[in-house]
């Protein structure tokens, strides 16, 4: 009996020690926030995403495993701006966990047509300057809920913010190669408003947001007319949706199909955009290449 008690005590102490030494755990709603948060957290915390690489995030359907994952977190980070329309109902099943919106302080652009007209465009991370606000909000959340690692988070956030700031000039130089008369970015989803605003591009798209009907005859006809009227040479699609509507527009308008852009999700680690910085670089390079520059 005495030996059994000693064993149980040792196991309990061991479990307590493991819990005491366990890293702070962050769960995010999608992979872009996961990568930004991991850069801020460094080795002081683990960061996991509910949605997997390549997943469609707007109308994601959470699973019981996702609830378990969120319940195991010390902190949950989500985008807000009506991106994750599933999140608030999902969060009702998660008890006593802090959830922080990482877009606080961003000036949102409005969706200008469709059922979501005048609602905020949620894809704010497509502006590097907005990414700095994401970094600051994530850092503040980590410092608040894991203060013992505050110095680590402060340093990592400053270092990562500097990397993001250094992206702007090369991205701007690449996009400046597109002639003024051709500076139209035509895509499937209207997810590039922030990128277009930052880098002086006009925007056209088949549907405003992925919750909409996608690739209806009316949408396709509207964009075909836009492309023809403005002599737009290239049309793009995005990685998390079908390319067929954009390809149809290209075929019927005489434009070129320029390939896949990345916005709503990172790729797997062995894919083309395993990080947020890769997402911006590859997307801009694909745009410029599509224009033949």
Curated annotation (Swiss-Prot):
Localization per Swiss-Prot or TrEMBL: Cell outer membrane; Cell surface; Periplasm
InterPro entries noted in UniProt: AdhesinB, Bact_metal-bind_prot9, Lipoprotein_PsaA-like, ZnuA-like
Stretch list, region Interaction with host components: 23-48
GO biological process, one term: metal ion transport
Phenotype seen when the gene is deleted: Mutant displays a reduced binding to laminin, vitronectin, and epithelial cells, and is more sensitive to killing by human serum compared with the wild type.
MF terms (GO), sorted A to Z: metal ion binding
Protein name in UniProt: Putative metal ABC transporter substrate-binding protein Hpf
Source organism of this protein record: Haemophilus influenzae (strain NTHi 3655)
Lineage: Bacteria, Pseudomonadati, Pseudomonadota, Gammaproteobacteria, Pasteurellales
